[in-house]
Amino acid sequence: MRTEAEAAGQPLEPGDFVQLPVPIIQQLYHWDCGLACSRMVLRYLGQLDDGEFENALQELQLTRSIWTIDLAYLMRHFGVRHRFCTQTLGVDKGYKNQSFYRKHFDTEETRVNQLFAQAKACKVQVEKCTVSVQDIQVHLAQGHVAIVLVNSGVLHCDLCSSPVKYCCFTPSGHRCFCRTPDYQGHFIVLRGYNRATGCIFYNNPAYADRMCSTSISNFEEARTSYGTDEDILFVYLDS
């Protein structure tokens, strides 16, 4: 029986605790965290075939420079329902002087802007909007997942007590990555939350053997840092 809220088309309040069984897949290199996150999501959806995945990378001409829009195109390639939310529809020219983006900025600017321009025609769902923690919790409560771009220099895992064996950047203490003043982009997969303790559960592709957890305040700081464009790729279970 449908509730009045469902009948009215209103979203139901999420549960107090969600922890989705998203498999952990470790990145192989310093640059492929986004691809590792995509593999996790596709495996969670039951759609990961290694051969098909490699063929998709070739067809989409993905290189070592992976942007969130690339991951959205990858989801579209596999017929996965998605919604890419960002604050910038294209490349922010202000990033040209940031060390993280500087090396390949000119060539990447043209490529990435073209992907944004062609998104609608290619049926890649892109939207310029602000996403709240409540929006994310509602999404996760329905069994869906999300790939989020964060500043790894800010992200802090409350569960990690040992250094990262392999990651994009040098670890320090309990942090998934060392805290540096410069932006360091990194993708993670959201898999749940605990409203009572105010934490977010996620998979960090730097690890092969654990789920990570951080406070909502730290997660918000990491995902809204300058350089992320607040990019979040919502992926739907009913794909």
Swiss-Prot record:
Signal sequence extent: none
Q: Which InterPro entries match?
A: GUCD1
Q: What is this protein called?
A: Protein GUCD1
Q: Which organism is it from?
A: Mus musculus (Mouse)
The upper taxonomy is: Eukaryota, Metazoa, Chordata, Craniata, Vertebrata
